[in-house]
Every structure is written in structure tokens, then in C-alpha cells.
């Protein structure tokens, strides 16, 4: 998103293997000890959670979050945050990180992932982007 809106930024590595995300300094900006998180030094704010970051940057920049279509954009962004992302994440967990550990998990999340991709293909066969003809934060978050 930062690339899309043309904002300058600096990446700060958080070493998850060493547990950097659990240090008190990091928990001040990300209370659940998760990435991503951004710090807007201009406005002296930290923002955590992918969807919240996308909304914040879209509102700040005035890009990819059309006021006339926000309900539709929000629907698709929330679908990504609450369904698409978590389900594809589970598929990845069972098929790539822990193959052979749970036949039930592998089959379940393979079927769900396949259905998600079919549903997204169906939506995108009818419109250029998820929420219509404009590229939005819903598309950025989902793809």
C-alpha cells in the first residue's frame, strides 16, 4: 500500500524467531504482538492490523477508498480479514508447514481454499475489481 500511494517508508525488522514481537516496546505499538504495524511519525500514531492499516493509509492519502463505494469496499475488505485470509492461511499451514499431520485439516482447508478461489473468480468475471470498476484497498488486501 505504501508503494501504491507513493509514501516514503522504512522497514524495521522484527525477529519473530527471537521473540522480538513480545518485547514491551513492540507491545506498545502492537498489543497482540503481531505484524504488520506501522508508525506514522507525521501524525504520531501507530496502527496495527492489516485492514486498519489499509483504511488509515487510504483515508490519509485519499486513494483507493472511494467515498461513494465504501460500504462495498468495506464488505470485501472485511471478507478478506475474516474469511479469505484466515482460511487460506489454514490451508497453507496444513499443506506447506505441516503436511501429513492432519488428513482432516488438509482436506478441509483444501476444499475451502478451492471454493474461495472459485468464488473470487466468479466475482471477478462480472467486475474488473472486487468492489466494482475501481482498484481499492479491498483488492490490495486480498491479493
Predicted segments with their positions:
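GST-like domain detector, emphasizing the conserved glutathione-binding G-site
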Residues: 1-114, 121, 128
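GST superfamily/GST-like fold recognition
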Residues: 87-92, 130-143
Amino acid at each position: 500500500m505504501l508503494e501504491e500511494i507513493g509514501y516514503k517508508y522504512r522497514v524495521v525488522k522484527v525477529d519473530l524467531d527471537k521473540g522480538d514481537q513480545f518485547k514491551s516496546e513492540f507491545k506498545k505499538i502492537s498489543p497482540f504482538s503481531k505484524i504488520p504495524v506501522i508508525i506514522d511519525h507525521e501524525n504520531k500514531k501507530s496502527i496495527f492490523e492489516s485492514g486498519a492499516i489499509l483504511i488509515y493509509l487510504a483515508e490519509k492519502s485519499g486513494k483507493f477508498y472511494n467515498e461513494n463505494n465504501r460500504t462495498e469496499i468495506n464488505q470485501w475488505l472485511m471478507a478478506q480479514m475474516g474469511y479469505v485470509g484466515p482460511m487460506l492461511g489454514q490451508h497453507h499451514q496444513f499443506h506447506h508447514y505441516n503436511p501429513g499431520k492432519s488428513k482432516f485439516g488438509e482436506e478441509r482447508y483444501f476444499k475451502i481454499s478451492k471454493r474461495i478461489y472459485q468464488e473470487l473468480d466468479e466475482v471477478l468475471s462480472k467486475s474488473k475489481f472486487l468492489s466494482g470498476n475501481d482498484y481499492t484497498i479491498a483488492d490490495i488486501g486480498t491479493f
